[in-house]
Structures are given as structure tokens and as C-alpha cells.
């Protein structure tokens, strides 16, 4: 847990341009791992913030015509500042509007990580793909989708689902931790995007080990929280997840991580 230990020591400033539904949960999750979240959205202050920040999360969950240009502007400012971007194209396949905006953003700025479920990442590489809301699609071949997305966008791809897939360069990793309760809490996936950003430490081409650790820390914490005797369902799971992120230690991490490199 080298990256998490560094987060707990250095408290990296993590800027989150995220959706209105999840801001509080995302901020609290980042605080739980030791990061310092800032939910800054104004392009007018981006240049100053990005000089001292370690990463930027862009999450389009509540995309509107009013914030389109702000998102493009902050992404370009992040590029100019050498700040890595984690892009979460929430529900990109649900509407033509979302898909067109995501394509525009990815043409207008360079992102370091694209994170989404299989349906969302498929929508970025296949114009005919559709999806149901923000749900993951267990029937899709996530490894193949991730590899195709990497080939197109030349950026790290993280696909979440029952198993999580990470593709960076010539490596493809499958991670098998997590809990079904994550799908019962709104904003859990959005928090993961923020946590990935917290692990980047200003690396615009992040090491795959940072991504593996970020995803595994989150999912192992979810497992432990779900197994807690005080967890009665989604309502008690959420605060227990934050507590477990705060207390997670090396022993638990190493005992539980389930990882496989695939062709």
C-alpha cells in the first residue's frame, strides 16, 4: 500500500469537478483515505488551484449545456498545468448529447485515466452502443473493450463491474474484490473516480501499480465494510465504507487482494 501510505502522509490536493448528487460522498471518501478534496468548479480559479493540486477528477453525471464550456476549459487548463485528469463519462451511452460531449472533451484535452463501467467505455468506442442508465453490463467482455479503448485513446482505462479491468500500455489486469452493496449506493462508482485521482500524485502517465492499488483499496474496503456485523444494508454500508477506508491496513490489503494479469 505504498501509494495509500503516501496519501496519508502528504494529503494530496485532489480537485473534483463532479456531479451534484455525489459531491458530499466523494469529498468524505477522499478525506477518509487522507487526501484533501476541493470541489472547485470555476475556470477562473483553475490556474491557481492546479499549480498546487495533484490531480483533477471530471465526472459528467449532471452534465448541462451551462457547464459544458467550463468542463472543456478546466480540462485544458489542467493540461497546461501538467495536472493528470481522471475522466468519468457517466451514462455516456444513455444519450446522443452525452456521447457527443464526451467525444468533444476527449478531442479537446488529454486525460490520464478513463474510468467507467463496460457499457460506458463501449459507448466511447462504438457509436451504435447504448446503455441502461449508469448500470454495469455483466455480459460485455470488459478486457476486450478496455484494450480497444486504450488503442483509440492511448490513455489508461479502468472498467468497473463484478470484476474490474485495468489496461495501461501492454498490460491488462483483472481485479476481483468488491461487494454487491456498492451497486446499491448512489455515488460509489463516482467516489472510486475520485480515489483514483487521489492516487496519481501529478503523474500524467500513471504507473499501472497506482491504478491497481486505488481500485483494490476501494474494493477491499467495501468487502470489509459489507462483512461488518453492523452492516444491515446500503444505509449502514456507506458510513462503514468510509470508516474502513480510513482504517485499512497493509495486512488486510495483502490478505484480500485478488489480482490476475491477462493476455
UniProtKB/Swiss-Prot annotation:
Its EC number is 2.7.1.50. It catalyses: 5-(2-hydroxyethyl)-4-methylthiazole + ATP = 4-methyl-5-(2-phosphooxyethyl)-thiazole + ADP + H(+). Keywords: ATP-binding, Kinase, Magnesium, Metal-binding, Nucleotide-binding, Thiamine biosynthesis, Transferase. Pathway: Cofactor biosynthesis; thiamine diphosphate biosynthesis; 4-methyl-5-(2-phosphoethyl)-thiazole from 5-(2-hydroxyethyl)-4-methylthiazole: step 1/1. ATP binds at residues 115, 160. One of its GO terms (molecular function) is magnesium ion binding. SUPFAM superfamilies: Ribokinase-like. InterPro entries: Hyethyz_kinase, Ribokinase-like. Substrate binds at residues 39, 187. One of its GO terms (biological process) is thiamine biosynthetic process. Its cofactor is Mg(2+). It is an enzyme of class 2 (transferase). It holds the Pfam family HK. Catalyzes the phosphorylation of the hydroxyl group of 4-methyl-5-beta-hydroxyethylthiazole (THZ). Belongs to the Thz kinase family. This is Hydroxyethylthiazole kinase. It comes from Staphylococcus aureus (strain MRSA252).
Amino acid at each position: 500500500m505504498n501509494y495509500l501510505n503516501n496519501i496519508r502522509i502528504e494529503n494530496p490536493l485532489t480537485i473534483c469537478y463532479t456531479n451534484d448528487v455525489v459531491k458530499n460522498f466523494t469529498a468524505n471518501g477522499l478525506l477518509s483515505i487522507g487526501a484533501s478534496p476541493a470541489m472547485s468548479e470555476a475556470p477562473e480559479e483553475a490556474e491557481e488551484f492546479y499549480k498546487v493540486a495533484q490531480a483533477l477528477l471530471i465526472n459528467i453525471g449532471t452534465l448541462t449545456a451551462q457547464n459544458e464550456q467550463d468542463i472543456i476549459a478546466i480540462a485544458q487548463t489542467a493540461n497546461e498545468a501538467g495536472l493528470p485528469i481522471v475522466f468519468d463519462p457517466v451514462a455516456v451511452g444513455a444519450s446522443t448529447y452525452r456521447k457527443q460531449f464526451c467525444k468533444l472533451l476527449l478531442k479537446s484535452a488529454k486525460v490520464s485515466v478513463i474510468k467507467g463501467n463496460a457499457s460506458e467505455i463501449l459507448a466511447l468506442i462504438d457509436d451504435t452502443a447504448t446503455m441502461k442508465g449508469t448500470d454495469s453490463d455483466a455480459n460485455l467482455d470488459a478486457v476486450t473493450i478496455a484494450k480497444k479503448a486504450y488503442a483509440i485513446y492511448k490513455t489508461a482505462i479502468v472498467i468497473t463491474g463484478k470484476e474490474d479491468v485495468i489496461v495501461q500500455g501492454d498490460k491488462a489486469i483483472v481485479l476481483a474484490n468488491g461487494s454487491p452493496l456498492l451497486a446499491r449506493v448512489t455515488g460509489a462508482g463516482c467516489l472510486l473516480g475520485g480515489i483514483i485521482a487521489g492516487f496519481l500524485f501529478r503523474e500524467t502517465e500513471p504507473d499501472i501499480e497506482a491504478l491497481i492499488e486505488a481500485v483494490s483499496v476501494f474494493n477491499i474496503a467495501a468487502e470489509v465494510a459489507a462483512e461488518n456485523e453492523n452492516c444491515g444494508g446500503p444505509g449502514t454500508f456507506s458510513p462503514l465504507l468510509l470508516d474502513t477506508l480510513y482504517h485499512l491496513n497493509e495486512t488486510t490489503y495483502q490478505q484480500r487482494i485478488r489480482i490476475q494479469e491477462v493476455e
